Amino acid sequence: MDQLAQTEKYSPFRFFSAEQWSRFRADTPLTLSEDEFRRLRSLNDPVDLEEVKRIYLSLSRLLSAHVEASQLLFRQRQAFFNAVDIVKTPFIIGIAGSVAVGKSTTARVLKELLARWPSSPKVDLITTDGFLLPNEVLRRENLMERKGFPDSYDVGALLRFLSGIKSALPDVRAPVYSHLTYDVIPGEFVTIDRPDILIFEGINVLQPGKLPQDGKIVPFLSDFFDFAIYIDADEKLIHEWYISRFMRLRETAFRNPDSFFHRYSQLSEEAARAIAEGLWSNINLKNLRENILPTRARADLILRKGADHLVEEVALRKL
């Protein structure tokens, strides 16, 4: 985060080492067991319960404070409008960052920690994968090699979904994506029914659109977020994690004959690694540099990872 921390005096962020951040846990209890955490962890992600204690319990405590403040503001607005029939809207947490940086593990761990607060809030988790355009459309538009780039998503559907959630509508539907077939599953949806908290995870969720010249209101996804988190790491580390994950998948999920990537499991290790390097260089690295990393400074909190996926530094936006 060198560019963000050049002079903290003029930065919109406060910076903490992992050790400093861990002290903010206070008396927040660890409510996850080793077995539960193991089920939440993504493939090739070595994060353990010690990291949850060190980083995520403090983050859970911080988010609890933000949710509590949001609820207080809601009650004050009710009084301001002299209205009691206004429906409380969900608190939305956006999580962004590169492919292979550990967003999914972070999102799942936070979901479990937040749901176990004493108030027992209803917490749901949605990823942007289901909002990718179907492969048939991507092929027709010559976008298959830009899958994951902003133009490969159904932005209208994303905005309608988040608008429905923020409007406290019941039974808002999100499409479902299959990592086995590498495609949206036709006609399959997950229903989100007025959660207290929604975690919305995806590589480009902090991506702003082009500002209209005529001043019309054009919402960005992040306009619906109450708190945004960016998972950060050095480019070289993300590259290592991506290649390592690809090679692990080659030995596991890719061996399924129904897998979109099954053909890669038939290649030699050298050939498979060359494919992975090409996918990284031509697609994922390009997307990171052009679209994902530039959104980092739009987050409220940045978790900067070092080796072994362990957080080394935390940046929190000043109030």
UniProtKB/Swiss-Prot annotation:
One of its GO terms (cellular component) is cytoplasm. InterPro entries: P-loop_NTPase, PanK, PRK/URK. It catalyses: (R)-pantothenate + ATP = (R)-4'-phosphopantothenate + ADP + H(+). ATP binds at G97, S98, V99, A100, V101, G102, K103, S104. Its EC number is 2.7.1.33. Coiled coil: none annotated. Keywords: ATP-binding, Coenzyme A biosynthesis, Cytoplasm, Kinase, Nucleotide-binding, Transferase. It is found in: Cytoplasm. GO terms for biological process: coenzyme A biosynthetic process. Transmembrane segments: none annotated. The keyword Kinase applies. GO terms for molecular function: ATP binding; pantothenate kinase activity. The keyword Nucleotide-binding applies. Pathway: Cofactor biosynthesis; coenzyme A biosynthesis; CoA from (R)-pantothenate: step 1/5. NCBIfam families: panK_bact. Belongs to the prokaryotic pantothenate kinase family. This is Pantothenate kinase.
